[in-house]
Curated annotation (Swiss-Prot):
The lineage of its organism: Eukaryota, Fungi, Dikarya, Ascomycota, Taphrinomycotina. It comes from Schizosaccharomyces pombe (strain 972 / ATCC 24843). InterPro entries: WD40/YVTN_repeat-like_dom_sf (IPR015943), WD40_repeat_dom_sf (IPR036322). Its main location: cytoplasm. WD repeats lie at residues 14-53, 62-104, 148-187, 937-977. This is Uncharacterized WD repeat-containing protein C16H5.13. GO terms for molecular function: dynein complex binding; microtubule plus-end binding. It comes from the Eukaryota. The keyword Kinase does not apply. Keywords: Cytoplasm, Nucleus, Repeat, WD repeat.
């Protein structure tokens, strides 16, 4: 029985609730418990059997499958490092004393089951995959992949001085591997397997039994435990059904847990080795919820408010109260810096990554500020002397905490200060030279209007009480200790922060020289308050205004498939907004009540990290109901449909209140503009595929009438304000949506609309210095637009734009590259025809290399059939290639053709073009425009063709027949005509044998010279004499 089947066959119902224990680890006086919910709890087990919950770690969203503890020492800090692994492959490294998540690592290969410490430098991860990942402990990075396993590997403890590492497998075999630790390479030395009964099942674990005898180990099968010596010699066995785990006690007693019982066995050596049953305890023992604690077997059960420790051999039950876990702290203040979100709660402060939160719905904190206690009322990061970033946190009780930012999203605690003011609502940092020697000043403003000043050495300088008036403005002078304080009752005070004196001040012109405004907080100005993202807490909703430029710069859309397209279908099937069918009252699936369409708002990012929908009176999380609904899907959906909401009559105020994401440079009238056009222009095909799938499925859910209204709305923007193409971002956004809808649903448009739109974009691409945006818009729906414009003009503009942006031709995420790819996918034959005819003839010779580069990209992305494509090559492209043979880009074109169509090739001088046509080899002599066909048919399917450098020999490989065929090109002299004619004959056939008949065999000609070639098919490498 394998681990997956064992997990699914467990009878206990606690697993389904996510509360049950999924892994346990003991280290010194600590007991670390991982749960199916992903939570990790750390208990301090004292000598009097008293359990104390000292820490909880929350980062995993899947069952914690394995835990390892290591001593940690760095920068004078001595701590315990706890490394946790969940089934999804997420690795987290925690520091116990500081509660810091020091590092994370994500594996994506299968179900990860076990974390194993190989030595002081390396950890190993095994699971339901045929490899072992090696992770260097010092930098927490994958440094090697141990392959060569034919079954799921099982690692178990071995002697440190051993030169060979044993690895067990489910069939009972054990391989001994030698390791070169410098090169991190592995070599299998020997394989052993004990002769055991096949009824025992499969091996699920190996437990060393050195306390019983040297070189002994218990092999845990699904239905028996077997004691082996040296992993090979059978000693004794004991049969039990549905075994889940086995532990060996210090006295040599084996404790065996099954799904329904716990059994204690003792091994006796005489008269012959056998196991003796000592005792048996019945009961449901959850999978992996049992361990050996203080040399005694114990089972753990977790409930919402407590965890129980059942001592099986003693019959006693201890418990530990978990009330601290059920106290959910409310968010009292939110603050952002770049893509980090700081949430001040009623019990402390934590920092999250907006990048992870927004894109992955992963609310795991990056850092916890454990020194901060009490209700956080204000915080801010300041740049002080020597460019140090200092985070200042204030609480309701009047305490201030100072942290310095370190590398790797870490913070160093500096100090804590008790202020004379309470309920701090504002902190200001003034850079000025004081007579005390400090170069800066922190000013804390209280709810009652009082002020407190500290210098940059965190010394309390002065306190200024208030009679209830609120501060409106502070005026600071660089070289004086005085600060002018202006109140809302028109009072002005001159406050000397060093001498702790205060006098009445007078307004004068000098006051205007420098000031810091701390006036009323203006919500409408939120995106411009800070350089980056910012956050606001209103009505228990954390509103995050995200700088989309920073977000996209931190993405790598080409390599990260973080959204499956099936998720889009599930998400759209779940959330169909009622405003799309405004004439029909719909009962909302979340709240179960009928509501007015104008009350719908979008929210992303509650304090718990869930995406939400917000209404005028209530908000509801949809993550639990729709598990594949991510914040990114929510945002993409509403970015497409928000203009329709506006068209339906939603007011600016209500809609702006519900939209959480804005660009920092947008005006209030541009609230409906999304990040869509920016992401589309700065992302690869993965992200663009997500957007297209999202829009395609959205259009399927919209009735024809609603779609017409949507198209009409976007046309309204673009036709009425088309002259302000570069002044209004909303026009660009409308054009992006229209061009995408054209590519997905052209039948929804009138012919007049398509003509107008395509002509408009073509004119913009010409008049705006071959504008990339207009070119990108035309490429979105090229298959449709090309019917209403002269495609040669557009392609001419495309080439001129390529000339201006040659570097973009090598950037797969650039606007230009994506435009060429989309046009190629849509109609590569038309693109190449235009390039070879109209465009190539109009260009000067120094521009033809750019055209050839575009040609190679078009060929690489074509989806045309070879028969149609081959006619274009012979009639249009070959003369151009032959005349430009000295240009380097010609070889890019020939390589692209050979890559896209492996059964076609060129010689090194680009004088002969060859291809396979229904078993016949055809050689086209480019200069003479003459076609030569082989005299004999190959009578097999040739997948790969390659020519010798001179074009005299051709090698073809057939994977189906496992055969290699060699043709010779020669000139036959005819005497009575006194001339020579070319001929193609099969010189030899070579049968290639592979080691395995069922392996996937993809043929390949690795290299070819004038006299020989190397062919690879399946597991065979053959060097052939031509």
């Amino acid at each position: 029985m394998d681990w997956v089947a064992l997990s699914k066959s467990c009878k206990t119902h606690l697993l389904d609730e996510g509360l049950d224990v999924s892994s346990i680890h003991c280290f010194d006086q600590y007991l670390i418990v991982g749960q199916c919910s992903g939570q990790v709890m750390v208990f301090d087990v004292s000598t009097d059997n008293h359990f104390t919950l000292i820490q909880t770690f929350i980062a995993h969203k899947h069952s914690v499958s394995s835990i390892v503890c290591l001593p940690f020492e760095a920068d004078g800090i001595v701590d315990l490092s706890i490394i946790t692994l969940d089934e999804s492959g997420l690795l987290c490294q925690w520091l116990l004393k500081t509660c810091d998540r020091r590092a994370t690592l994500q594996l994506c290969d299968g179900l990860c089951l076990k974390l194993f410490r190989l030595n002081n430098n390396f950890l190993a991860v095994t699971g339901t995959f045929l490899k072992i990942y090696l992770i260097r402990i010092s930098n927490f990075q994958i440094v090697a992949t141990w392959t060569g396993h034919e079954d799921w590997p099982i690692l178990f403890p071995f002697k440190d001085e051993a030169l060979l590492i044993p690895v067990a497998y489910s069939d009972g075999s054990v391989s001994l591997w030698s390791v070169d630790w410098s090169a991190l390479t592995f070599k299998r030395n020997s394989v052993t397997k004990a002769d055991v009964k096949p009824t025992f099942g499969k091996v699920i674990d190996v437990v060393p039994a050195d306390c019983i005898s040297s070189n002994y180990a218990l092999y845990v099968y699904s239905d028996a435990v077997v004691l082996l010596e040296s992993h090979e010699k059978f000693i004794a066995s004991y049969s039990l059904a549905e075994i889940t785990s086995v532990f060996v006690l210090a006295d040599g007693t084996a404790c065996i847990f099954t799904l329904s019982s716990s059994t204690l066995l003792k091994l006796h050596q005489s008269p012959e080795p056998h196991f003796e049953l000592i005792s048996k305890y019945s009961g449901d023992f959850p999978w992996k919820s049992c361990t050996i604690l203080k040399s005694k077997p114990v089972s753990l059960c977790v409930y919402p408010e407590k965890i129980t420790f059942n001592w099986l051999t003693e019959g006693t039950v201890d418990s530990c109260n978990l009330c601290k876990l059920s106290n959910t702290a409310a968010v009292s203040y939110a603050y952002t810096d770049s893509l980090n979100l700081f949430l001040g709660t009623t019990s402390g402060l934590v920092m999250f990554s907006l990048f992870d939160w927004y894109l992955h719905n992963d609310p795991a904190p990056l850092y916890s500020f454990t020194r901060v206690s009490g209700i956080v009322t204000y915080m801010k990061i300041f740049e002080t002397e020597h460019s140090r970033s200092i985070l200042v946190v204030a609480t309701k009780t009047g305490k201030a905490y100072f942290y310095q930012q370190l590398q790797g999203e870490r913070w160093r605690f500096l100090c804590e200060r008790a202020l004379q003011s309470s309920s701090i609502t504002k902190i200001i940092h003034a850079k000025k030279s004081l007579s005390s020697g400090s170069s800066g000043l922190f000013i804390f403003m209280s709810l009652d209007g009082s002020l407190c000043a500290l210098d940059e050495s965190y010394n309390l300088l002065s306190y200024l009480p208030s009679d209830g008036a609120q501060v409106e403005t502070l005026y600071s002078f660089p070289d004086l200790d005085q600060i002018y304080v202006a109140y809302d009752n028109f009072q002005l005070l001159n406050w000397d922060v060093v001498d702790q004196k205060c006098s009445e001040g007078n307004y004068s012109d000098i006051i205007d020289s420098s000031f810091i405004s701390i006036g009323t907080f203006d919500k409408s100005n939120l995106p411009t308050l800070y350089h980056g993202s910012c956050a606001l807490l209103t009505d228990n909703l954390v509103t995050v205004f995200l700088d989309a430029h920073d977000l996209v710069l931190n993405l790598n859309f080409s390599n990260e498939n973080y959204i499956e397209k099936t998720y889009i279908d599930e998400f759209l099937d779940f959330i169909q907004p009622p405003f799309l069918n405004s004439d029909i009252e719909m009962e909302h699936q979340l709240l179960g009540t009928v509501f007015d369409q104008s009350s719908l708002h979008l929210g992303v990012g509650k304090p718990d990290g869930n995406a939400i929908l917000r209404f005028d009176t209530e908000m509801k999380s949809i993550i639990n109901t729709a598990p594949n609904c991510s914040a990114l899907l929510l945002y993409l959906y509403f970015s497409l449909m928000v203009p329709l909401c506006k068209y339906d009559g939603l007011s600016d105020t209500k809609l702006t209140e519900g939209i959480l994401l804005k660009l920092k440079d947008l005006k209030t009238v541009d609230y409906s503009i999304s990040v869509l056009s920016y992401v589309w222009n700065n992302s690869g095909k993965v992200m663009q595929g997500i957007i297209k799938s999202m829009l395609s499925r959205t259009l399927e859910l919209i009735s024809p009438e609603e779609l017409q209204r949507l198209i009409y709305y976007y046309f309204e923007f673009f036709t009425t304000t088309g002259g302000e193409y570069y002044l209004k971002k909303e026009v660009q956004h409308s054009l992006y949506i229209l061009s995408l809808i054209v590519s997905l649903r052209p039948s929804a448009f009138d012919v007049s609309q398509l003509k107008f739109l395509s002509s408009y974009l073509l004119q913009k691409s010409e008049s705006m210095d071959y504008d990339l945006t207009a070119i990108r818009l035309l490429s979105n729906g090229f298959s449709v637009f090309s019917k209403h414009i002269d495609p040669a003009k557009f392609i001419y503009n495309l080439v001129l734009s390529s000339l201006e942006n040659t570097k973009d031709l090598d950037d797969k995420n650039s606007i230009l590259y994506r435009s060429i790819v989309d046009v190629s996918v849509s109609n590569a034959v038309l693109l190449l025809t235009c390039l070879c005819d109209e465009v190539y003839e109009q260009m000067k010779s120094n521009l033809r290399s750019v055209i050839l580069k575009v040609v190679s990209l078009a060929i690489e992305n074509t989806q045309s059939e070879f028969s149609l494509f081959n006619q274009l090559i012979t009639e249009k492209l070959l003369p151009i290639l032959y005349s430009s043979r000295s240009v380097e880009e010609v070889h890019d074109v020939t390589n692209a053709i050979a890559t896209q169509f492996p059964f076609a090739c060129f010689d090194s001088k680009v004088e002969k073009y060859s291809y396979i046509d229904d078993g016949d080899l055809v050689v086209y002599e480019i200069a003479k425009r003459r076609k030569v066909v082989s005299k004999e048919n190959a009578e097999c399917d040739i997948q790969v063709l390659s020519a010798s450098p001179s074009g005299d020999y051709f090698v073809g490989v057939s994977a189906t027949q496992k055969e290699c065929i060699i043709w010779k090109y020669s000139q036959d002299f005819v005497k009575f005509l006194n001339l020579s004619t070319p001929s193609l004959t099969i010189r030899k056939r070579i049968l290639l044998q592979t080691n395995k008949t069922n392996e996937v065999e993809i043929p390949e000609v690795l290299w070819i010279s004038q006299s020989s070639a190397e062919v690879h098919i399946g597991s065979t490498f053959a060097i052939i004499d031509l």
